[in-house]
Swiss-Prot record:
Tissue specificity annotation: Expressed at high levels in adult ovary.
Keyword Cytoplasm applies: yes
DNA-binding region: 61-80
Name under which the protein is recorded: Proliferating cell nuclear antigen
Biological processes, Gene Ontology terms: DNA damage response; DNA replication; DNA-templated DNA replication; eggshell chorion gene amplification; leading strand elongation; mismatch repair; mitotic spindle organization; nucleotide-excision repair
Length: 260
């Protein structure tokens, strides 16, 4: 028997919004430690990795390991039926071919449940190697989303350059060239507004704008985003999900700067 309950459906809605544009379907691997999802995006360019810890749920029970293949579009339709403040519970029997998603209003006067068919998905687990990154940047998630959106108007690619002076985002195309520089912040009143750069050595890498913009769909989950970079290694874009886990996106750099 598997059962997981969250106090607010809005969290699950935001998680799904963060991945459904990249993935049509995915397997949720459930164990007593929580829920994991790992999948290549539809075009096999980026990797999505989601971790939700069991202790972050209001209630969590998983008697035996369970893999639930789900159509994320179908799941999004079901979640649209929930109010943001509703409790949401996911339940499945061992070896079941369906999952039940139940919404309960805060005053418990309304309970709705939806049954969704599970899918058999052949998904290989890719080993993600531990990497000592040359540069790790923590910055406001809204700021990163805005930079990615703005630079996408100039080019299909964005160059991220990290030095001890700061981090620079650049794009160049027919319209012209755009450069946005962020220096490390001094003291800030609010931690979520800080820009923090940990650099071992400078790094300059080029990435596809459309994937970065897809990753920023996770912005509502977190006030800060962490970018981890190293030459010839995929960029890691990480959003923490408060008290519950994190979502990470991996994107390989473009080999040549002039490649579109």
């Amino acid at each position: 028997m598997f059962e997981a309950r969250l106090g607010q459906a809005t969290i699950l809605k935001k998680i799904l919004d963060a991945i459904k544009d990249l993935l049509n379907e995915a397997t949720f691997d459930c164990s007593d430690s929580g829920i994991q999802l790992q999948a290549m995006d539809n075009s096999h360019v980026s990797l999505v990795s989601l971790t939700l810890r069991s202790d972050g749920f209001d209630k969590f029970r998983c008697d035996r390991n369970l893999s639930m293949g789900m159509n994320l579009g179908s799941m999004a339709k079901i979640l649209k039926c929930a109010n943001n403040e509703d409790n949401v519970t996911m339940k499945a029997q061992d070896n079941a071919d369906t999952v039940t998603i139940m919404f309960e209003s805060a005053n418990q006067e309304k309970v709705s449940d939806y049954e969704m068919k599970l899918m058999n998905l052949d998904q290989e687990h890719l080993g993600i190697p531990e990497t000592d990154f040359s540069c790790v940047v923590r910055m406001p998630a809204m700021e990163f989303a805005r930079i990615c959106r703005d630079l996408a108007q100039f080019s299909e690619s964005v160059v991220i350059c990290c030095t001890k002076e700061g981090v620079k985002f650049s794009a160049s195309g027919d319209v012209g060239t755009a450069n946005i520089k962020l220096a490390q912040t001094g003291s800030v009143d609010k931690e979520e507004e800080a820009v923090i750069i940990e650099m071992q050595e400078p790094v300059t890498l080029t990435f596809a704008c459309r994937y970065l913009n897809a990753f920023t769909k996770a912005t509502p989950l977190s006030t800060q985003v962490q970018l981890s970079m190293c030459a010839d290694v995929p960029l890691v874009v990480e959003y923490a999900i408060k008290d519950l886990g994190h979502i990470r996106y991996y994107l390989a750099p473009k080999i040549e700067d002039n490649e579109t």
